[in-house]
From Swiss-Prot:
Expressed in which tissues: Expressed in stomatal guard mother cells, young stomata and trichomes of young leaves, and inflorescences.
Lineage of the species this protein comes from: Eukaryota, Viridiplantae, Streptophyta, Embryophyta, Tracheophyta
Disulphide linkage map: none
GO terms under biological process: negative regulation of trichome patterning; regulation of DNA-templated transcription; root hair cell development; trichome patterning
PANTHER family to which the protein is assigned, alphabetical: MYB-LIKE TRANSCRIPTION FACTOR ETC2-RELATED, TRANSCRIPTION FACTOR MYB51-LIKE ISOFORM X1
Gene name of this polypeptide: ETC2
Protein name: MYB-like transcription factor ETC2
Function: MYB-type transcription factor involved in epidermal cell fate specification. Acts as a negative regulator of trichome development, by mediating lateral inhibition. Promotes the formation of hair developing cells in H position in root epidermis, probably by inhibiting non-hair cell formation.
GO CC annotation: nucleus
Domain of life: Eukaryota
SMART domains noted in UniProt: SANT
Length: 112
């Protein structure tokens, strides 16, 4: 083991690695409490669910198929859609007058 390797070991990770990890965590890590519900079209929801059944939680592959969406955005959508923790937010959205695809609103629209 020569002297340069010893110096490198003593110094720890390079500045480039620490900058990368710091910027990655600063940009992507957000507390789940601060998440806003992500609205997707029916086509996007269908595509995401089919892709998830096909490839699992490989969000990069799924994001490659959904135009204009990032992998972390799709992952957050999936977590919020399928997690018990966010069920109260979904219920609140379904009861709002602006959300027109709830079963009650569909029945009312059919009667008209």
């Amino acid at each position: 083991m020569d002297n340069t390797n010893r110096l490198r070991l003593r110094r720890g990770p390079s500045l480039r690695q620490t900058k990368f990890t710091r910027s990655r965590y600063d940009s992507e890590e957000v507390s789940s409490i601060e998440w806003e519900f992500i609205s997707m079209t029916e086509q996007e929801e269908d595509l995401i669910s089919r892709m998830y059944r096909l490839v699992g939680n490989r969000w990069d592959l799924i994001a490659g198929r959904v135009v204009g969406r990032k992998a972390n955005e799709i992952e957050r959508y999936w977590i919020m859609r399928n997690s018990d923790y966010f069920s109260h937010k979904r219920r609140r959205l379904n009861n709002s007058p602006f959300f027109s695809t709830s079963p009650l609103n569909l029945q009312e629209n059919l009667k008209l």
